[in-house]
Amino acid sequence: GKAWQYTRDIRYAEKWARLIEDWIDRIPLTEESEANTWRSLEAGLRCEYWLRSVKLVQDSGVLTSQLREKIDGCLRTHGEYLVRKSGEFQKISNWGVLQNHGLLLLGVYLERSEWTALALKRLDENLHRSVMADGSQWEQSPMYPLRSAAQCCRCAAGSATEQSCSAGAL
């Protein structure tokens, strides 16, 4: 998407379309794929990155109505999956923040208020569980809490609102 935006070379947008369609066709959600390509961490991240990339190529002409329907269908599958993927581990780890940030964005994008509310509830619980009294984060690695904090700040600042999602703030 970014290569298309920077160069306006249609080959980049066409390649993006082929890659995302190929991924959707070849990597369905199965019990087996939940252990690798469909781990909840990657599924949450994919929501954000796919929504961003769709926005980047939308003026290229490659985003046909058929491809858009296919992407939206796969994103609905992501949302349904993320709704049911929640356990004690996600309530304290960066995985919970990243997957629920994805669910939050999908809730806004697909106008599923119940997903948005659930994601916000889970993010709030994660924040209260994973941040210690001294301000340190449970993961004990600077990368994880910074990424997690950035996602929480985006949510708190309203970058997951319908207006900002449709305006390209993703």
Describe every region a protein language model picked out.
Residues 1-170:
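Aromatic-lined, polymer-binding surfaces characteristic
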